[in-house]
Regions:
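Glycine-/Pro-rich loop/turn segments that contact NAD(P) or position catalytic residues
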Residues: 111-130, 137, 144
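Short glycine-biased active-site loop of nucleotidyltransferases that positions the nucleotide triphosphate
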Residues: 44, 144-145
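Glycine-rich phosphate-binding loop of ATP-grasp-fold ATP-dependent ligases
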Residues: 131-132, 151-164
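Nucleotide-sugar donor-binding and catalytic loop/hinge architecture
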Residues: 146-150
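A short, flexible beta-alpha/helix-coil linker loop
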Residues: 102, 125, 158-161
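Structural signal for short hydrophobic segments within the conserved structured cores
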Residues: 51-53, 110, 130-134, 164
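ATP-binding N-terminal substructure of ATP-dependent carboxylate-amine bond-forming enzymes
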Residues: 1-108, 113, 117, 139
Length: 164
């Protein structure tokens, strides 16, 4: 039996689909970490969830580490740590590194969470990528546009759109 801890910041409809998918797997013990209380777990899923640990901020690697450590003591060793949100990948990697859980590590998570770093890694591997620059000011952005021309796409280095 594989013990999976799923990080569900909130028990929203889309997140519940992932919780349900893990809950329906044979030979999986499922525990969830969430900012929501245990009562927020949808009633049909509760019988398949072995445990719940509530944290104030599921995006905080320290809080997740504390939660997973407590889950390991209370329910048993954790084999996998999963979560659907892109923003969870770095804090979950911090937990894996801290507790020796198999899966994506911090260095790798940073490679795909930070767009500038990701492009540098791809370039080093010989993968062609579009010209890019980490512009920290309007002047740096103008200099990049002067060098490469239009069109350009401007994105934050990490995060979703304008919510970096």
């Amino acid at each position: 039996v594989v013990h999976v801890v799923f990080v569900a910041p909130r028990f929203l409809e889309n997140t519940n689909r992932y919780v349900r998918a893990f809950a329906e797997l044979d030979d999986v013990t499922l525990t969830v970490v969430s900012a929501d209380p245990e009562a927020a777990i949808p009633a049909p899923l509760r019988p398949r969830v072995a445990g719940h640990y509530q944290v104030a901020d599921p995006l905080d690697g320290g809080q997740l580490t504390t939660a997973v450590r407590a889950i390991s003591r209370g329910i048993g060793p954790v084999d996998r740590l999963a979560g659907a949100l892109e923003q969870l990948q770095l804090p979950m990697a911090e937990v894996r590194d801290a507790l020796g859980i198999d899966g994506l590590r911090v260095a790798t998570a940073r490679n795909f969470r930070d767009k500038d770093r990701m492009k540098a890694v791809l370039r080093q591997a010989g993968v062609p990528v579009a010209a890019s620059a980490l512009a920290r000011s309007p002047a740096e952005l103008r200099a990049f546009v002067d060098r490469v021309g239009y069109p350009v796409i401007v994105k934050p280095p990490a995060g979703l759109g304008s919510r970096a």
